Protein backbone atom coordinates (compact mmCIF):
# COMPACT_ATOMS: atom_id res chain seq x y z
CA UNK A 1 0.00 0.00 0.00
CA UNK A 2 1.33 3.42 -0.99
CA UNK A 3 0.48 6.69 0.65
CA UNK A 4 0.54 8.50 -2.70
CA UNK A 5 0.77 7.37 -6.31
CA UNK A 6 1.60 10.02 -8.89
CA UNK A 7 0.66 9.26 -12.47
CA UNK A 8 3.04 10.97 -14.88
CA UNK A 9 6.78 11.71 -14.63
CA UNK A 10 6.88 15.00 -16.48
CA UNK A 11 7.99 18.23 -14.87
CA UNK A 12 4.77 18.53 -12.84
CA UNK A 13 4.70 14.94 -11.60
CA UNK A 14 8.40 15.13 -10.73
CA UNK A 15 7.92 18.43 -8.88
CA UNK A 16 5.05 16.95 -6.88
CA UNK A 17 7.13 13.88 -6.04
CA UNK A 18 10.05 16.02 -4.90
CA UNK A 19 7.87 18.08 -2.57
CA UNK A 20 6.03 15.05 -1.17
CA UNK A 21 9.36 13.40 -0.30
CA UNK A 22 10.07 16.17 2.19
CA UNK A 23 7.72 14.12 4.39
CA UNK A 24 7.83 10.59 5.72
CA UNK A 25 5.55 8.78 3.29
CA UNK A 26 5.64 6.02 0.68
CA UNK A 27 5.35 7.47 -2.83
CA UNK A 28 5.45 5.88 -6.28
CA UNK A 29 5.50 7.58 -9.68
CA UNK A 30 3.98 5.59 -12.56
CA UNK A 31 5.09 6.61 -16.07
CA UNK A 32 4.07 4.95 -19.33
CA UNK A 33 7.26 6.14 -21.06
CA UNK A 34 10.70 4.66 -20.49
CA UNK A 35 12.11 7.76 -18.80
CA UNK A 36 11.08 10.99 -17.15
CA UNK A 37 10.29 13.96 -19.39
CA UNK A 38 8.64 11.94 -22.17
CA UNK A 39 5.49 14.00 -22.78
CA UNK A 40 4.74 17.73 -22.82
CA UNK A 41 7.88 18.41 -20.79
CA UNK A 42 10.20 17.24 -23.57
CA UNK A 43 8.95 19.64 -26.26
CA UNK A 44 8.27 23.21 -25.20
CA UNK A 45 9.87 26.65 -25.32
CA UNK A 46 11.92 26.38 -22.13
CA UNK A 47 10.67 29.80 -21.00
CA UNK A 48 10.37 30.95 -17.39
CA UNK A 49 7.47 33.36 -17.83
CA UNK A 50 7.32 36.57 -15.80
CA UNK A 51 3.56 36.24 -15.17
CA UNK A 52 1.96 39.22 -16.94
CA UNK A 53 -0.31 37.22 -19.27
CA UNK A 54 -2.35 35.15 -16.80
CA UNK A 55 -5.75 36.44 -15.68
CA UNK A 56 -5.43 38.25 -12.32
CA UNK A 57 -6.80 36.16 -9.48
CA UNK A 58 -6.48 32.89 -11.37
CA UNK A 59 -4.54 29.90 -10.08
CA UNK A 60 -2.35 30.19 -13.17
CA UNK A 61 -1.39 33.77 -12.26
CA UNK A 62 -0.59 32.94 -8.64
CA UNK A 63 1.55 29.91 -9.46
CA UNK A 64 3.29 31.64 -12.38
CA UNK A 65 4.64 34.49 -10.26
CA UNK A 66 5.58 32.13 -7.43
CA UNK A 67 7.27 29.65 -9.79
CA UNK A 68 9.26 32.46 -11.40
CA UNK A 69 10.31 33.77 -8.00
CA UNK A 70 11.71 30.47 -6.71
CA UNK A 71 13.28 29.21 -9.96
CA UNK A 72 16.67 30.82 -9.40
CA UNK A 73 17.21 29.46 -5.89
CA UNK A 74 15.92 26.04 -7.00
CA UNK A 75 18.39 25.98 -9.90
CA UNK A 76 21.23 26.42 -7.41
CA UNK A 77 19.90 23.77 -5.04
CA UNK A 78 19.30 21.16 -7.75
CA UNK A 79 22.09 22.21 -10.13
CA UNK A 80 20.25 22.82 -13.41
CA UNK A 81 20.76 25.61 -15.93
CA UNK A 82 18.67 28.78 -15.61
CA UNK A 83 19.16 32.40 -16.64
CA UNK A 84 17.10 35.57 -16.26
CA UNK A 85 17.46 36.99 -19.76
CA UNK A 86 14.30 39.15 -19.67
CA UNK A 87 11.49 39.23 -22.21
CA UNK A 88 9.85 41.70 -24.59
CA UNK A 89 6.28 41.69 -25.90
CA UNK A 90 6.15 43.58 -29.18
CA UNK A 91 3.49 45.92 -30.53
CA UNK A 92 3.52 46.73 -34.26
CA UNK A 93 0.66 49.23 -34.65
CA UNK A 94 -0.42 52.35 -32.82
CA UNK A 95 -3.91 50.92 -32.31
CA UNK A 96 -2.39 47.89 -30.49
CA UNK A 97 -0.78 50.01 -27.77
CA UNK A 98 -3.90 49.80 -25.62
CA UNK A 99 -3.67 45.99 -25.61
CA UNK A 100 -0.03 46.25 -24.57
CA UNK A 101 -1.01 48.60 -21.74
CA UNK A 102 -3.69 46.14 -20.59
CA UNK A 103 -1.04 43.41 -20.51
CA UNK A 104 1.15 45.67 -18.39
CA UNK A 105 -1.75 46.33 -15.99
CA UNK A 106 -2.46 42.60 -15.68
CA UNK A 107 1.18 42.06 -14.79
CA UNK A 108 1.05 44.76 -12.11
CA UNK A 109 -2.08 43.16 -10.60
CA UNK A 110 -0.34 39.77 -10.64
CA UNK A 111 2.62 41.20 -8.74
CA UNK A 112 5.22 40.96 -11.53
CA UNK A 113 8.17 43.19 -10.55
CA UNK A 114 10.07 45.57 -12.84
CA UNK A 115 7.63 45.79 -15.77
CA UNK A 116 8.25 48.68 -18.18
CA UNK A 117 6.44 50.02 -21.24
CA UNK A 118 9.02 50.96 -23.89
CA UNK A 119 8.91 52.86 -27.15
CA UNK A 120 10.02 51.11 -30.33
CA UNK A 121 13.38 52.89 -30.18
CA UNK A 122 13.94 51.88 -26.56
CA UNK A 123 13.12 48.27 -27.42
CA UNK A 124 15.57 48.31 -30.35
CA UNK A 125 18.31 49.62 -28.07
CA UNK A 126 17.83 46.46 -26.01
CA UNK A 127 17.52 44.22 -29.10
CA UNK A 128 19.09 45.74 -32.24
CA UNK A 129 17.67 43.06 -34.56
CA UNK A 130 14.04 43.95 -33.80
CA UNK A 131 11.90 45.03 -36.73
CA UNK A 132 11.67 48.74 -37.55
CA UNK A 133 7.89 48.29 -37.46
CA UNK A 134 7.90 47.79 -33.67
CA UNK A 135 6.24 50.88 -32.15
CA UNK A 136 6.17 49.79 -28.49
CA UNK A 137 7.08 46.89 -26.22
CA UNK A 138 6.48 45.53 -22.74
CA UNK A 139 9.74 44.67 -20.99
CA UNK A 140 9.78 42.08 -18.19
CA UNK A 141 13.26 41.78 -16.66
CA UNK A 142 12.26 38.78 -14.53
CA UNK A 143 11.57 36.57 -17.56
CA UNK A 144 14.03 33.73 -17.97
CA UNK A 145 15.08 30.59 -19.81
CA UNK A 146 15.66 27.08 -18.50
CA UNK A 147 16.40 23.63 -19.87
CA UNK A 148 13.08 21.77 -19.55
CA UNK A 149 14.91 18.43 -19.55
CA UNK A 150 17.38 19.59 -16.93
CA UNK A 151 14.66 20.91 -14.63
CA UNK A 152 12.53 17.76 -14.92
CA UNK A 153 15.44 15.36 -14.46
CA UNK A 154 16.76 17.33 -11.47
CA UNK A 155 13.38 17.22 -9.71
CA UNK A 156 12.93 13.51 -10.44
CA UNK A 157 16.45 12.56 -9.34
CA UNK A 158 16.06 14.46 -6.10
CA UNK A 159 12.70 12.84 -5.41
CA UNK A 160 14.28 9.44 -6.09
CA UNK A 161 17.26 9.88 -3.75
CA UNK A 162 14.78 10.93 -1.06
CA UNK A 163 12.87 7.68 -1.42
CA UNK A 164 10.30 8.06 -4.21
CA UNK A 165 9.89 5.03 -6.46
CA UNK A 166 9.75 5.50 -10.24
CA UNK A 167 8.22 2.80 -12.42
CA UNK A 168 8.66 3.25 -16.17
CA UNK A 169 6.86 1.49 -19.01
CA UNK A 170 3.89 1.38 -16.63
CA UNK A 171 0.73 2.65 -18.31
CA UNK A 172 -2.44 3.10 -16.27
CA UNK A 173 -5.33 1.26 -17.93
CA UNK A 174 -7.99 1.45 -15.23
CA UNK A 175 -8.82 2.40 -11.65
CA UNK A 176 -11.17 1.17 -8.94
CA UNK A 177 -12.24 3.19 -5.89
CA UNK A 178 -12.02 1.05 -2.76
CA UNK A 179 -13.24 2.01 0.70
CA UNK A 180 -10.25 4.19 1.67
CA UNK A 181 -7.93 3.78 -1.28
CA UNK A 182 -7.60 3.31 -5.03
CA UNK A 183 -6.58 0.20 -6.94
CA UNK A 184 -4.64 1.37 -9.99
CA UNK A 185 -4.51 -1.14 -12.85
CA UNK A 186 -1.47 -0.87 -15.12
CA UNK A 187 0.25 -2.78 -17.89
CA UNK A 188 2.62 -4.06 -15.18
CA UNK A 189 0.13 -5.10 -12.55
CA UNK A 190 -2.01 -3.48 -9.87
CA UNK A 191 -1.00 -0.82 -7.34
CA UNK A 192 -2.92 0.32 -4.27
CA UNK A 193 -2.67 3.81 -2.82
CA UNK A 194 -4.56 5.97 -0.36
CA UNK A 195 -4.14 9.05 -2.57
CA UNK A 196 -3.67 9.35 -6.35
CA UNK A 197 -2.25 12.47 -8.02
CA UNK A 198 -3.20 12.76 -11.67
CA UNK A 199 -0.34 14.52 -13.50
CA UNK A 200 -0.78 12.76 -16.83
CA UNK A 201 -0.58 15.75 -19.18
CA UNK A 202 -2.82 15.47 -22.23
CA UNK A 203 -4.20 12.19 -20.82
CA UNK A 204 -5.25 13.66 -17.47
CA UNK A 205 -8.87 13.81 -18.64
CA UNK A 206 -8.85 10.09 -19.43
CA UNK A 207 -7.67 9.25 -15.92
CA UNK A 208 -10.09 11.71 -14.30
CA UNK A 209 -12.97 10.12 -16.18
CA UNK A 210 -12.06 6.69 -14.79
CA UNK A 211 -13.09 7.79 -11.29
CA UNK A 212 -15.51 10.72 -11.65
CA UNK A 213 -19.03 11.02 -13.02
CA UNK A 214 -18.35 14.67 -13.82
CA UNK A 215 -16.40 14.26 -17.04
CA UNK A 216 -13.40 16.31 -18.11
CA UNK A 217 -12.28 17.12 -21.65
CA UNK A 218 -8.78 18.31 -22.49
CA UNK A 219 -7.73 19.37 -25.96
CA UNK A 220 -4.29 18.48 -27.28
CA UNK A 221 -2.90 21.75 -28.61
CA UNK A 222 0.05 21.16 -30.92
CA UNK A 223 2.96 23.55 -31.27
CA UNK A 224 5.65 23.26 -33.95
CA UNK A 225 9.15 24.69 -33.58
CA UNK A 226 12.36 25.28 -35.51
CA UNK A 227 15.72 25.06 -33.75
CA UNK A 228 18.77 26.92 -35.05
CA UNK A 229 22.41 25.99 -34.66
CA UNK A 230 24.50 27.77 -32.02
CA UNK A 231 25.83 30.00 -34.80
CA UNK A 232 22.52 31.86 -34.51
CA UNK A 233 22.36 31.75 -30.71
CA UNK A 234 23.34 35.38 -30.24
CA UNK A 235 20.75 36.75 -32.65
CA UNK A 236 18.65 37.94 -29.68
CA UNK A 237 19.49 38.01 -25.99
CA UNK A 238 15.94 38.28 -24.66
CA UNK A 239 12.82 36.24 -25.29
CA UNK A 240 10.78 38.03 -27.94
CA UNK A 241 6.99 37.62 -27.86
CA UNK A 242 4.23 39.09 -29.98
CA UNK A 243 0.94 40.14 -28.39
CA UNK A 244 -0.83 37.02 -27.08
CA UNK A 245 -4.01 35.63 -28.64
CA UNK A 246 -6.77 33.32 -27.43
CA UNK A 247 -4.57 30.38 -28.53
CA UNK A 248 -1.55 31.33 -26.46
CA UNK A 249 1.47 33.57 -26.37
CA UNK A 250 2.08 33.40 -30.11
CA UNK A 251 5.27 32.80 -32.07
CA UNK A 252 8.35 33.66 -30.03
CA UNK A 253 12.05 34.01 -30.75
CA UNK A 254 14.37 33.09 -27.91
CA UNK A 255 17.88 32.02 -27.11
CA UNK A 256 17.99 28.64 -25.42
CA UNK A 257 19.87 28.03 -22.21
CA UNK A 258 22.47 26.04 -24.18
CA UNK A 259 23.12 28.72 -26.80
CA UNK A 260 20.83 27.81 -29.69
CA UNK A 261 18.04 29.96 -31.15
CA UNK A 262 14.45 28.67 -30.97
CA UNK A 263 11.39 29.94 -32.85
CA UNK A 264 7.78 28.82 -32.46
CA UNK A 265 5.30 27.47 -31.52
CA UNK A 266 2.19 27.26 -33.62
CA UNK A 267 -1.11 26.52 -31.88
CA UNK A 268 -3.35 23.89 -33.48
CA UNK A 269 -5.99 21.86 -31.65
CA UNK A 270 -5.83 18.23 -32.77
CA UNK A 271 -7.61 14.96 -31.92
CA UNK A 272 -4.51 12.74 -31.87
CA UNK A 273 -2.88 12.88 -28.44
CA UNK A 274 0.24 11.30 -29.92
CA UNK A 275 0.32 13.70 -32.90
CA UNK A 276 3.93 14.83 -32.55
CA UNK A 277 4.49 15.26 -36.28
CA UNK A 278 5.63 18.46 -37.94
CA UNK A 279 4.06 19.78 -41.14
CA UNK A 280 5.25 21.95 -43.98
CA UNK A 281 2.34 24.29 -43.33
CA UNK A 282 3.12 24.57 -39.64
CA UNK A 283 6.82 25.24 -40.08
CA UNK A 284 6.08 27.79 -42.78
CA UNK A 285 3.77 29.57 -40.32
CA UNK A 286 6.54 29.58 -37.70
CA UNK A 287 9.02 31.19 -40.10
CA UNK A 288 6.54 33.68 -41.52
CA UNK A 289 5.23 34.93 -38.17
CA UNK A 290 8.63 34.96 -36.45
CA UNK A 291 9.94 37.12 -39.29
CA UNK A 292 7.50 39.88 -38.30
CA UNK A 293 9.43 40.47 -35.06
CA UNK A 294 12.85 41.10 -36.60
CA UNK A 295 14.43 42.74 -39.63
CA UNK A 296 15.66 39.40 -40.97
CA UNK A 297 15.84 35.93 -39.45
CA UNK A 298 19.12 33.99 -39.58
CA UNK A 299 19.47 31.92 -42.78
CA UNK A 300 17.44 28.72 -43.10
CA UNK A 301 20.61 26.66 -43.55
CA UNK A 302 21.36 27.25 -39.86
CA UNK A 303 18.22 25.35 -38.78
CA UNK A 304 19.34 21.96 -37.47
CA UNK A 305 16.00 20.39 -36.55
CA UNK A 306 12.28 20.92 -36.12
CA UNK A 307 9.92 19.31 -33.64
CA UNK A 308 6.41 19.45 -32.22
CA UNK A 309 4.98 19.27 -28.73
CA UNK A 310 1.49 18.93 -27.25
CA UNK A 311 0.06 20.86 -24.33
CA UNK A 312 -3.20 20.11 -22.52
CA UNK A 313 -5.70 22.92 -23.02
CA UNK A 314 -8.76 23.29 -20.82
CA UNK A 315 -11.73 25.40 -21.96
CA UNK A 316 -11.76 27.67 -18.88
CA UNK A 317 -8.11 28.59 -19.53
CA UNK A 318 -6.91 27.87 -16.02
CA UNK A 319 -5.16 25.04 -14.26
CA UNK A 320 -7.29 22.38 -12.55
CA UNK A 321 -5.55 21.48 -9.29
CA UNK A 322 -8.01 20.06 -6.79
CA UNK A 323 -9.39 16.99 -5.11
CA UNK A 324 -12.18 15.55 -7.25
CA UNK A 325 -15.52 16.17 -5.55
CA UNK A 326 -17.00 12.74 -6.16
CA UNK A 327 -13.69 10.85 -5.90
CA UNK A 328 -12.12 11.75 -2.56
CA UNK A 329 -8.40 11.10 -2.44
CA UNK A 330 -8.00 11.63 -6.20
CA UNK A 331 -6.24 14.92 -6.96
CA UNK A 332 -6.28 16.36 -10.47
CA UNK A 333 -3.31 18.36 -11.72
CA UNK A 334 -4.75 18.95 -15.17
CA UNK A 335 -4.85 21.50 -17.98
CA UNK A 336 -1.22 22.39 -17.32
CA UNK A 337 -0.27 24.33 -20.44
CA UNK A 338 1.87 27.47 -20.63
CA UNK A 339 3.19 28.69 -18.20
CA UNK A 340 3.23 25.18 -16.71
CA UNK A 341 7.01 24.75 -16.87
CA UNK A 342 7.49 27.96 -14.88
CA UNK A 343 4.77 26.99 -12.42
CA UNK A 344 5.94 23.40 -11.85
CA UNK A 345 7.93 23.99 -8.63
CA UNK A 346 5.05 26.05 -7.21
CA UNK A 347 2.54 23.41 -8.32
CA UNK A 348 4.62 20.82 -6.46
CA UNK A 349 4.28 22.81 -3.23
CA UNK A 350 0.58 23.50 -3.84
CA UNK A 351 -0.23 19.81 -4.33
CA UNK A 352 1.91 18.82 -1.34
CA UNK A 353 -0.25 21.14 0.79
CA UNK A 354 -3.42 19.48 -0.53
CA UNK A 355 -2.00 16.05 0.30
CA UNK A 356 -0.84 17.16 3.77
CA UNK A 357 -4.32 18.47 4.59
CA UNK A 358 -5.78 15.16 3.47
CA UNK A 359 -3.17 12.94 5.12
CA UNK A 360 -0.74 14.75 7.45
CA UNK A 361 2.79 13.36 7.63
CA UNK A 362 5.95 14.05 9.61
CA UNK A 363 8.63 16.16 7.95
CA UNK A 364 11.87 14.30 7.28
CA UNK A 365 14.93 15.38 9.22
CA UNK A 366 17.25 13.85 6.62
CA UNK A 367 15.66 15.27 3.45
CA UNK A 368 18.36 15.79 0.81
CA UNK A 369 17.84 19.26 -0.65
CA UNK A 370 20.98 19.58 -2.78
CA UNK A 371 21.82 17.71 -5.97
CA UNK A 372 25.01 17.69 -8.00
CA UNK A 373 24.33 17.52 -11.74
CA UNK A 374 26.44 16.07 -14.53
CA UNK A 375 29.64 18.05 -15.01
CA UNK A 376 29.87 19.41 -18.56
CA UNK A 377 33.37 19.25 -20.01
CA UNK A 378 32.40 21.81 -22.67
CA UNK A 379 31.64 24.47 -20.06
CA UNK A 380 34.31 23.44 -17.52
CA UNK A 381 37.45 25.49 -17.01
CA UNK A 382 40.80 24.06 -18.13
CA UNK A 383 41.67 23.29 -14.52
CA UNK A 384 38.34 21.51 -13.98
CA UNK A 385 38.85 19.50 -17.17
CA UNK A 386 42.31 18.38 -16.05
CA UNK A 387 40.94 17.40 -12.66
CA UNK A 388 38.12 15.32 -14.15
CA UNK A 389 40.45 13.55 -16.59
CA UNK A 390 42.97 12.78 -13.84
CA UNK A 391 40.20 11.07 -11.85
CA UNK A 392 38.67 9.27 -14.84
CA UNK A 393 40.30 9.06 -18.31
CA UNK A 394 36.81 8.58 -19.83
CA UNK A 395 36.46 12.37 -19.62
CA UNK A 396 39.22 12.64 -22.25
CA UNK A 397 37.29 10.53 -24.76
CA UNK A 398 35.03 12.85 -26.78
CA UNK A 399 31.95 10.99 -28.05
CA UNK A 400 29.82 13.87 -29.40
CA UNK A 401 31.99 16.35 -31.30
CA UNK A 402 29.24 18.90 -31.97
CA UNK A 403 28.52 19.42 -28.26
CA UNK A 404 31.90 18.18 -26.96
CA UNK A 405 30.32 15.51 -24.76
CA UNK A 406 32.70 12.92 -23.34
CA UNK A 407 32.35 9.28 -22.40
CA UNK A 408 32.70 10.29 -18.75
CA UNK A 409 29.56 12.43 -18.95
CA UNK A 410 27.62 9.64 -20.65
CA UNK A 411 28.73 7.15 -18.00
CA UNK A 412 27.58 9.55 -15.29
CA UNK A 413 24.20 9.89 -17.05
CA UNK A 414 23.81 6.10 -17.06
CA UNK A 415 24.91 5.33 -13.51
CA UNK A 416 23.49 8.25 -11.53
CA UNK A 417 20.06 8.01 -9.82
CA UNK A 418 17.33 7.27 -12.41
CA UNK A 419 20.08 6.65 -14.96
CA UNK A 420 19.43 6.85 -18.70
CA UNK A 421 18.52 3.64 -20.54
CA UNK A 422 17.62 5.16 -23.91
CA UNK A 423 19.38 7.29 -26.50
CA UNK A 424 17.04 10.20 -25.84
CA UNK A 425 17.72 9.76 -22.13
CA UNK A 426 21.43 10.27 -22.81
CA UNK A 427 20.67 13.21 -25.10
CA UNK A 428 18.53 15.02 -22.54
CA UNK A 429 21.04 14.53 -19.74
CA UNK A 430 24.28 15.30 -21.62
CA UNK A 431 23.32 16.90 -25.00
CA UNK A 432 25.09 14.11 -26.90
CA UNK A 433 23.30 14.15 -30.26
CA UNK A 434 21.86 17.65 -29.83
CA UNK A 435 24.29 19.44 -32.13
CA UNK A 436 24.43 20.29 -35.79
CA UNK A 437 24.84 16.71 -37.06
CA UNK A 438 21.94 15.52 -34.85
CA UNK A 439 23.77 12.38 -33.67
CA UNK A 440 25.10 11.45 -37.11
CA UNK A 441 28.57 11.02 -35.63
CA UNK A 442 28.00 9.97 -32.00
CA UNK A 443 24.99 7.65 -32.32
CA UNK A 444 26.91 4.35 -32.85
CA UNK A 445 29.33 5.14 -30.01
CA UNK A 446 26.54 6.10 -27.63
CA UNK A 447 24.69 2.88 -28.46
CA UNK A 448 27.83 0.86 -27.74
CA UNK A 449 28.25 2.52 -24.35
CA UNK A 450 24.60 1.94 -23.40
CA UNK A 451 24.85 -1.68 -24.52
CA UNK A 452 28.06 -2.25 -22.56
CA UNK A 453 26.95 -0.56 -19.34
CA UNK A 454 23.47 -2.10 -19.19
CA UNK A 455 24.78 -5.46 -20.47
CA UNK A 456 22.15 -5.55 -23.20
CA UNK A 457 22.53 -6.49 -26.86
CA UNK A 458 23.05 -3.35 -28.93
CA UNK A 459 20.03 -4.29 -31.05
CA UNK A 460 17.75 -3.82 -28.02
CA UNK A 461 18.78 -0.18 -27.49
CA UNK A 462 15.89 2.18 -28.27
CA UNK A 463 15.66 5.85 -29.14
CA UNK A 464 12.92 6.63 -26.62
CA UNK A 465 9.77 4.52 -26.43
CA UNK A 466 8.92 0.86 -26.75
CA UNK A 467 9.83 -0.48 -30.20
CA UNK A 468 11.89 2.54 -31.32
CA UNK A 469 14.85 0.38 -32.34
CA UNK A 470 17.62 1.65 -34.58
CA UNK A 471 19.08 -1.70 -35.62
CA UNK A 472 17.43 -4.36 -37.78
CA UNK A 473 18.74 -7.27 -39.82
CA UNK A 474 19.40 -10.63 -38.19
CA UNK A 475 19.21 -9.43 -34.59
CA UNK A 476 15.84 -7.74 -35.19
CA UNK A 477 14.43 -10.87 -36.85
CA UNK A 478 15.73 -12.98 -33.99
CA UNK A 479 14.19 -10.67 -31.41
CA UNK A 480 10.82 -10.84 -33.17
CA UNK A 481 10.90 -14.62 -33.41
CA UNK A 482 12.18 -14.94 -36.98
CA UNK A 483 15.12 -16.95 -38.24
CA UNK A 484 18.43 -16.17 -39.90
CA UNK A 485 17.01 -17.36 -43.22
CA UNK A 486 14.38 -14.60 -43.13
CA UNK A 487 16.86 -11.74 -43.59
Language-model-derived ranges and their functions:
Residues 248, 257-258, 274-398, 405-418, ...:
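C-terminal catalytic lobe of FAD-dependent flavoproteins
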Residues 46-126, 250-251:
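Dinucleotide-binding Rossmann-like beta1-alpha1 core, especially the glycine-rich loop
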Residues 55, 62-65, 90-99, 138-157, ...:
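Short beta-strand to alpha-helix junction loop
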Residues 274, 406-417, 440-458:
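Iron-sulfur (Fe-S) cluster-binding segments and ferredoxin-like electron-carrier domains
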Residues 138-195:
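Helical element adjacent to the flavin cofactor pocket in flavoenzyme catalytic cores
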Residues 2-29:
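N-terminal Rossmann-like FAD-binding beta1-loop-alpha1 element of flavoenzymes
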Residues 15, 175-180, 186-264, 268-279, ...:
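Flavin-dependent oxidoreductases
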Residues 22-43:
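Glycine-rich FAD pyrophosphate-binding loop
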Amino acid sequence: MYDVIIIGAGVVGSAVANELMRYDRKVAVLEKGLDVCEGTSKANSGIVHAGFDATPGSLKAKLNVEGNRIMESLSKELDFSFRRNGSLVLCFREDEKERLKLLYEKGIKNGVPGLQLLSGEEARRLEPNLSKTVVAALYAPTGGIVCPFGLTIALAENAYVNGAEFHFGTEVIGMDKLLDSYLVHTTKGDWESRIVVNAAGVYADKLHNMVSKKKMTLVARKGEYCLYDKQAGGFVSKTIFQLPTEYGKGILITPTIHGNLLIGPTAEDIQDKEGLYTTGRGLEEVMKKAALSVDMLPPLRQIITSFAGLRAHEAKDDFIIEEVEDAKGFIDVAGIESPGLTCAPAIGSFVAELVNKKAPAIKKENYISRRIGIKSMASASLEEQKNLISKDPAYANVICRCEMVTEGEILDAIHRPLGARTLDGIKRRTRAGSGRCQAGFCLPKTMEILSREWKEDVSSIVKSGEGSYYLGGYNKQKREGGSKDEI
